[in-house]
């Protein structure tokens, strides 16, 4: 893989999760452009820089030890990539503090480097949080590959930060620079709320949760077919989102024990708040993680999963395949994985390579619900 070479450093970077013979690199031209732009401004060593949505740590690791850097984002895999890439390049483990998107950072910051996220609601929430956290004369510099840079990103920066200047294109990347100006303090419109009729639930979604404004159609197809009569089963909701699968299952299985895990900090935050609203103080475990990678082998009886088919702008089934493998490792012999997926993704044949038996529980014209037994 090529090295990331910038005026700040030459780094050997890897993506997360790691894949054998991964054809994708851990940085792109937008990362290079952001670092070059910052270097051209010649900030001194005391310059406090906030890095937002740094996919695999390319920005923060490049600046580690040279400026006062804080990184923040919603991806646990992004956090893990930053830690691994710091170590991989001989940089101190703690040289870049990381603040999950479910928490708030503390300014003031002189510069903010932003990778424009796929979900503009996350960008809006971050820009609102920046109000009152920027030093006089501060700049917010957002970067993206042009094909992933919507006009609305600049509009949001103008609305919440100040006047925006777009750069020339360079290697198919573009920067948007907002100089801090007086703006009215905004009230965040997040989390979003919606009501589910069956089961009767009022649910909230923080800004970066998938299908933020309502129940996604895959989950809607899955809900009527969740397993019942689980007794004291140990159940995990893998890629839990706002927790609706686990909550619906828990309402039907009052003795079961639940673990809710997602790689999105805002998803886990949403799930925890929704669980509390629906089930009160009933115990459950919540954490942001690389799926079930940290769980003991054969520690679960049931796994529920509505697997994602993209990582940021990269589409594919590699994340789903990884989740299926993790579920197999975590399940006891005789345990079961229940999933929902688009028909065209061919999950039945993939599961058959890992599990003793795979059966179709239900189907709609678009989705299939499968049960795979270990």
Curated annotation (Swiss-Prot):
It is found in: Cytoplasm. Its EC number is 2.1.1.174. The keyword rRNA processing applies. GO terms for molecular function: 23S rRNA (guanine(1835)-N(2))-methyltransferase activity; nucleic acid binding. It comes from the Bacteria. CDD domains: AdoMet_MTases. InterPro entries: DNA_methylase_N6_adenine_CS, rRNA_m2G-MeTrfase_RlmG, RsmC/RlmG, SAM-dependent_MTases_sf, Small_mtfrase_dom. PANTHER family: RIBOSOMAL RNA LARGE SUBUNIT METHYLTRANSFERASE G, RIBOSOMAL RNA SMALL SUBUNIT METHYLTRANSFERASE C. Specifically methylates the guanine in position 1835 (m2G1835) of 23S rRNA. HAMAP family: 23SrRNA_methyltr_G (MF_01859). Belongs to the methyltransferase superfamily. RlmG family. This is Ribosomal RNA large subunit methyltransferase G. It comes from Pseudomonas putida (strain ATCC 700007 / DSM 6899 / JCM 31910 / BCRC 17059 / LMG 24140 / F1). The lineage of its organism: Bacteria, Pseudomonadati, Pseudomonadota, Gammaproteobacteria, Pseudomonadales.
């Amino acid at each position: 893989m090529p090295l990331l070479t910038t005026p700040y450093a030459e780094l050997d970077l890897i993506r997360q999760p790691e894949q054998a013979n991964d054809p994708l690199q851990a940085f792109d031209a937008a990362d290079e452009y952001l670092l070059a732009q910052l270097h051209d401004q010649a900030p001194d060593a005391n310059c406090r820089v906030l890095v937002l949505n740094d996919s695999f740590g390319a920005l923060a690791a490049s600046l580690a030890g040279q400026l006062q850097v804080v990184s923040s984002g919603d991806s646990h895999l992004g956090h893990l990539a930053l830690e691994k890439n710091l170590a991989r390049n001989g940089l101190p483990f703690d040289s870049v503090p990381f603040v999950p998107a479910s928490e708030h950072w503390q300014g003031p910051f002189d510069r903010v480097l932003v990778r424009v996220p796929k979900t503009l609601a996350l960008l809006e929430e971050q820009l609102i949080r920046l109000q009152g956290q920027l030093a006089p004369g501060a700049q917010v510099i957002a970067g993206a590959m042009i094909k992933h840079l919507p006009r609305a990103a600049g509009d949001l920066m103008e609305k919440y930060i100040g006047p925006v200047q777009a750069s020339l294109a360079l290697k198919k990347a573009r920067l948007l620079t907002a100089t801090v100006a007086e703006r009215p303090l905004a009230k965040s419109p997040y989390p979003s709320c919606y009501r589910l009729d069956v089961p009767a639930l009022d649910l909230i979604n923080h800004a970066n949760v998938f299908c933020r404004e309502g129940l996604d159609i895959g989950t809607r197809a899955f809900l009527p077919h969740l397993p019942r009569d689980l007794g004291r089963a140990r159940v995990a909701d893998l890629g839990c989102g706002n927790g609706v699968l686990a909550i619906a299952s828990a309402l039907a299985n009052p003795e079961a024990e639940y673990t809710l895990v997602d790689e999105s900090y805002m998803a886990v935050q949403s799930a925890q708040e929704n669980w509390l609203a629906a089930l009160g103080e009933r115990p459950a475990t919540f954490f942001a993680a690389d799926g079930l990678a940290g769980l003991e082998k054969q520690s679960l009886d049931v796994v529920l999963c509505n697997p994602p088919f993209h990582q940021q702008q990269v589409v594919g089934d590699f994340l789903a395949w990884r989740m299926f493998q993790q579920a197999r490792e975590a399940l006891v012999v005789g345990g079961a994985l229940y999933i929902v997926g688009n028909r065209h993704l061919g999950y039945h044949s993939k599961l058959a390579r890992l599990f003793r038996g795979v059966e179709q529980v239900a189907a709609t014209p678009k989705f299939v619900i499968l049960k795979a037994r270990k």
